[in-house]
């Protein structure tokens, strides 16, 4: 101990002079390394001084200062530790360096760029080490430069929820984009949340009537279930979703949330205008009577926004389910774009791609969204998801992964749309877990299976008809073909949302009337009516009236 005190007193003056010299330098520049820049004797003296001024471990006295709380850290968001600086920008990926470990944000935390012309929010994705985090930008990074200050907000992206969102259009951050003022609400929720616990889930099974004949009869939707609309480009997915929103809002009076994920801006605008015209959305003083909230992240948005806008829409729907106990409809157009956006983000983050170029986390990304869409004891979320099928290939990993989460599938067929039959729903490929006599009842189940049997027999006979012609068929087969063609045309239906294109008023068909109409067809009650009278009508009464009209026109 005496030797340490002597060395300490001898070298204190030398250390003080060195510190004074260093103090005059720029404090932001790092000190030169002794091993590279100092003379050997100075380096040795420095090590001796370090040894002399240090306390031996055996004689260390207990500190009188109070112990620091080692529990959960709380950030001083206005302080020095919460401010980082941009150190790298690669498209939608931004790296941010923080000064110390205390201000380092956790994964999924949102950061805000300071002194930027527009609001730019970043979401933390990776911790790279050396106090650097890699983030995903929720908007364009044009004009962003290195050195720009970034604030750690200390929370995930948080969006407004509640009835104030009805009739409004929001972006991924919950900001209004309909130019109708701010969304005034006291309720906000983070977009990253856990799925409901198993003990909170409900197990009841009930049909959600849509008023669309082919759906209600052959592939009925479960209230609180997940339904997938499969189809290629231009076969009518978005039109079918618009009709479902219209019918469910008018027939059930429930709230809907529409999440536009990576689709055309024009279609988003058309949907908004159509909702205003149909009364689903009301403006001005009657806005509180609106039945739908819209969340858009369209094709022109960066991949970060398209990858998170589905979660924003789901968060709005969850509030109506959990806080207000409502049965909510969540429409996602298009769930494939959600997968596609996550694939883009994955590539930008440098992950090795998986099958067909998709991200290796495809299943977990989709599961994080789908598992939150469920029915609890408080309320339900019934989700209808349009699913674009690349090159009409149902074995593509994106639609194939989605199949595992669905309770019903509505497959739109290009062959049926080419026949001019709309909605172009394939009655044989579309499926539903609800198609069971224990859930639907014997009458509905037998009618649905009877219709499918006739259509399947007609499909099996088409090759024979193409080669030999109708004359070579037996009388029973001729009757099967005639009924199948009538059923095929009777499955078509004019939509309310397509009135301005077709000129025909839309039809909502009650489930009971729907079942009785098709049972009458199977029983042969309408074998004498022409095929043309079954095309683009509602119930069977309209078929009879149309047949009489055609007969009068032919007689004249």
Curated annotation (Swiss-Prot):
Region (Disordered) location: 1-37
GO BP, sorted A to Z: proton motive force-driven mitochondrial ATP synthesis
Catalysed transformations (reactions): ATP + H2O + 4 H(+)(in) = ADP + phosphate + 5 H(+)(out)
Record-level GO cellular component terms: mitochondrial inner membrane; proton-transporting ATP synthase complex
Coiled coil segments of this chain: none
Main subcellular location of this protein, as a coarse class: mitochondrion
Biased composition, class Low complexity, residue ranges: 1-20
Segment annotated as transit peptide: 1-51
UniProt function note: Mitochondrial membrane ATP synthase (F(1)F(0) ATP synthase or Complex V) produces ATP from ADP in the presence of a proton gradient across the membrane which is generated by electron transport complexes of the respiratory chain. F-type ATPases consist of two structural domains, F(1) - containing the extramembraneous catalytic core, and F(0) - containing the membrane proton channel, linked together by a central stalk and a peripheral stalk. During catalysis, ATP synthesis in the catalytic domain of F(1) is coupled via a rotary mechanism of the central stalk subunits to proton translocation.
PANTHER family per UniProt: ATP SYNTHASE, ATP SYNTHASE SUBUNIT BETA-1, MITOCHONDRIAL-RELATED
Name used for this protein in its record: ATP synthase subunit beta-1, mitochondrial
Lineage, highest ranks first: Eukaryota, Viridiplantae, Streptophyta, Embryophyta, Tracheophyta
């Amino acid at each position: 101990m005496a030797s340490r005190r002597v060395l300490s007193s001898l070298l204190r003056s030398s250390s003080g002079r060195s510190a004074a010299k260093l103090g005059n330098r720029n404090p932001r520049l790092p000190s030169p390394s002794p091993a590279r820049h100092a003379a050997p004797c100075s380096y040795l003296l420095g090590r001796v001084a370090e040894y002399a001024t240090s306390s031996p471990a055996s004689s260390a006295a207990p500190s009188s200062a109070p112990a620091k709380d080692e529990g959960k850290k709380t950030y001083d968001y206005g302080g020095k530790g919460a401010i980082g600086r941009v150190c790298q920008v690669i498209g939608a990926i931004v790296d941010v360096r923080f000064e110390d470990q205390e201000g380092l944000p956790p994964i999924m935390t949102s950061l805000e760029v300071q002194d930027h012309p527009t609001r730019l929010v970043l979401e933390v994705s990776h911790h790279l080490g050396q106090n650097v985090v890699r983030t995903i930008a929720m908007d364009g990074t044009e004009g962003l430069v290195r050195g720009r200050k970034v604030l750690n907000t200390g929370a995930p992206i948080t969006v407004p929820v509640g009835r104030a969102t009805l009739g409004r259009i929001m972006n991924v951050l919950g900001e209004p984009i309909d130019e109708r003022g701010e969304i005034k609400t006291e309720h906000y929720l983070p977009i990253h949340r856990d799925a409901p616990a198993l003990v909170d889930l409900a197990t009841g099974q009930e049909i959600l009537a849509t008023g669309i004949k082919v759906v209600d009869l052959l592939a009925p939707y479960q209230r609180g279930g997940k339904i997938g609309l499969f189809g290629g480009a231009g076969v009518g997915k978005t039109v079918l979703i618009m009709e479902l929103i219209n019918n469910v809002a008018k027939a059930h009076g429930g709230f809907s949330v529409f999440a536009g994920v990576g689709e055309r801006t024009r279609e988003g605008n058309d949907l908004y205008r159509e909702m205003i015209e149909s009364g689903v959305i009301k403006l001005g003083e009657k806005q509180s009577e609106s039945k739908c909230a819209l969340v858009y992240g369209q094709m022109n948005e960066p991949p970060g926004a398209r990858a998170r806008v589905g979660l924003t829409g789901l968060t709005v729907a969850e509030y109506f389910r959990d806080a207000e106990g409502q049965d909510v409809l969540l429409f996602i157009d298009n769930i494939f774009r959600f997968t596609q956006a996550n694939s883009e983000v994955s590539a930008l983050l440098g992950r090795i791609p998986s099958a067909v170029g998709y991200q290796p986390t495809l299943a977990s990304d989709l599961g994080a969204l789908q598992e939150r869409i469920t029915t609890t004891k408080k309320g339900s979320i019934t989700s209808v998801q349009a699913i674009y099928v690349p090159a009409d290939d149902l074995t593509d990993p994106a639609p194939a992964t989605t199949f595992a989460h669905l309770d019903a599938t509505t497959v739109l067929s290009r062959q049926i749309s080419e026949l001019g039959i709309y909605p172009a729903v394939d009655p044989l490929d579309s499926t539903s877990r609800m198609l069971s006599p224990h859930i639907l009842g014997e009458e509905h189940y037998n009618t649905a299976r009877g219709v499918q049997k006739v259509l399947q027999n007609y499909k099996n006979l088409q090759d024979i008809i193409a080669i030999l012609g109708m004359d070579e068929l037996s009388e029973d087969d001729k009757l099967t073909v005639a009924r199948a063609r009538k059923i095929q045309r009777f499955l078509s239906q004019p939509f309310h949302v397509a009135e301005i294109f077709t000129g025909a008023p839309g039809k909502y068909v009650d489930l009971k009337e729907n079942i009785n109409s098709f049972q009458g067809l199977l029983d042969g009650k309408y074998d004498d009516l022409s095929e043309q009278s079954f095309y683009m009508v509602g119930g069977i009464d309209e078929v009879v009236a149309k047949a009489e009209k055609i007969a009068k026109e032919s007689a004249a």
